[in-house]
Amino acid sequence: MNEIITALEAKYHPLGMIAYGSYADGTNNLNSDFDALLLTDSGSELHDSSVMSGVELDVWVYPRVKIEAPHDAYEFLQIWDGIIISDETGLLSSLQTEVREYIHSTAAKGREENLQNLNWCRKMLARTERGDFEGRYRRCRLLTDSLEIYCNIVGEYFFGAKKALRYMQQYAPDAATVYDAALSSPTFENLQRWIEILEKNFATRFPDS
């Protein structure tokens, strides 16, 4: 990671840099890319997907005016738990604070919206029984979309699949085991057990339902 940071500093001479993703939190593996946001004094906004030190980059470079101008914090959600490497102007620190405040201020989905999503999962489950082309598509859609629905039901912000899976493994290992079984062998029975996990968490969080 340090070698890549040094190379990026030499290439872009940034005013600041914040690393996020797997290299920043120590979960990187052989196929991980290096995620970072760089702030420059001038120039154009660009995305660097080149390879440095054998690692593919996923680096966004922004001129400072991009951050100084009115912007949507949602656009920078990925830096919420990033590591600030450098920050001459203080703009990256302010941006990260803004992103965190945005996340905390975002209202968690309530009972009715979660119930609608849960009912959608039940409908998708029923449609997987068809066993045809469309049924197999519904199965894939159910497995994908239900991960975010799970996060909503338990009251956690959805930061993407990787963080959601890690959260589940750490805080709800039983649910993770059931979900993994459904991913590994998406039979109707395994999918049904996963939906039952969603139903159980919904009933726990919204006991009046």
Identify the residue ranges that each predicted region occupies.
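Short gly/ser-rich loop at a beta-strand->alpha-helix junction or flexible surface loop bordering the NTP-binding
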Residues: 14-23
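Catalytic core of pol beta-like nucleotidyltransferases
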Residues: 1-9, 24-31, 39-209
